[in-house]
């Protein structure tokens, strides 16, 4: 029940729903799944201290992907992106924690792996922009939209993280 109230509040007042309760959407793309990188990616987010709220392995439909990447529809690579993302399974996840949207972008690294720093996911595991292993929400607003697109409300687990008091003051 408390999760439902928090989610409704977050959707009505996204700028107020931040801090340790901020959520982001991540998706390990088909190349990351095929290369068996899911565990390593989850490990990095857990070690950072973020809380996993939802995770599922899905074969994303082109319809879902067109909606997900709607802001890129005018780009020349849009059709290739949708085809690539629907070419195999995707691991969709929701993570929660302090400034998780911004921090997850730093963990992921630059979109173009050539610009990604060593130590980031893309810096360590990617060679080219067309196969860059992972998607991460670029803003709190995008995270709300993407989470609602990929997950039903009942799939978002609200649980008490016993390590929280070791992470936050």
UniProtKB/Swiss-Prot annotation:
Keywords: ATP-binding, Cell projection, Cytoplasm, Cytoskeleton, Kinase, Magnesium, Membrane, Metal-binding, Mitochondrion, Mitochondrion outer membrane, Nucleotide metabolism, Nucleotide-binding, Transferase. GO terms for molecular function: ATP binding; metal ion binding; nucleoside diphosphate kinase activity. Its main location: mitochondrion. GO terms for biological process: CTP biosynthetic process; DNA repair; dTMP biosynthetic process; GTP biosynthetic process; mitochondrial fusion; nucleoside triphosphate biosynthetic process; UTP biosynthetic process. Its EC number is 2.7.4.6. It comes from the Eukaryota. The keyword Hydrolase does not apply. It catalyses: a 2'-deoxyribonucleoside 5'-diphosphate + ATP = a 2'-deoxyribonucleoside 5'-triphosphate + ADP; a ribonucleoside 5'-diphosphate + ATP = a ribonucleoside 5'-triphosphate + ADP. It is found in: Mitochondrion outer membrane; Cytoplasm; Cytoplasm, Cytoskeleton, Cilium basal body. The keyword Membrane applies. NCBIfam families: PRK00668.1. HAMAP family: NDP_kinase (MF_00451). Catalyzes the phosphorylation of ribonucleosides and deoxyribonucleoside diphosphates, other than ATP, into the corresponding triphosphates with ATP as the major phosphate donor. The ATP gamma phosphate is transferred to the nucleoside diphosphate beta phosphate via a ping-pong mechanism, using a phosphorylated active-site intermediate. Through the catalyzed exchange of gamma-phosphate between di- and triphosphonucleosides participates in regulation of intracellular nucleotide homeostasis. Inhibits granulocyte differentiation. May be required for ciliary function during renal development. Independently of its kinase activity, facilitates mitochondrial tethering prior to membrane fusion through its direct membrane-binding and hexamerization. Implicated in repair of both single- and double-stranded breaks in DNA through its association with the ribonucleotide reductase complex (RNR complex) via its interaction with the histone acetyltransferase KAT5, this interaction enables recruitment of NME3 at DNA damage sites where it plays a role in the repair of DNA, independently of its kinase activity. Homohexamer. Interacts (via its N-terminal region) with KAT5; this interaction enables recruitment of NME3 at DNA damage sites where it plays a role in the repair of DNA. Found in association with several ciliary nephronophthisis proteins, including NEK8, CEP164, ANKS6. The N-terminal hydrophobic region (1-17) is critical for mitochondrial outer membrane targeting and phosphatidic acid binding. This is Nucleoside diphosphate kinase 3. It comes from Mus musculus (Mouse).
């Amino acid at each position: 029940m408390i999760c439902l109230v928090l989610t409704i509040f977050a959707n009505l007042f996204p700028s107020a729903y931040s801090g340790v309760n901020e959520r982001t959407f991540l998706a390990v793309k088909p190349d990351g799944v095929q290369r068996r990188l899911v565990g390593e990616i989850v490990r990095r987010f857990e070690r950072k201290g973020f809380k996993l709220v939802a995770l599922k392995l899905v074969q994303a439909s082109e319809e879902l992907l067109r909606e997900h990447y709607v802001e890129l529809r005018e780009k020349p690579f849009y059709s290739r992106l949708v085809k690539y993302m629907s070419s195999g399974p995707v691991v969709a996840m929701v993570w929660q924690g302090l400034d998780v949207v911004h921090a997850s972008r730093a963990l992921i690294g630059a979109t173009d792996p050539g610009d990604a720093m060593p130590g980031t996911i893309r810096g360590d595991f990617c060679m080219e922009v067309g196969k860059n292993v992972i998607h991460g929400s670029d803003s709190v607003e995008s995270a709300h939209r993407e989470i609602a697109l990929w997950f039903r409300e009942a799939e978002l687990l609200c649980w008490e993280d016993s390590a929280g008091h070791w992470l936050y003051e």
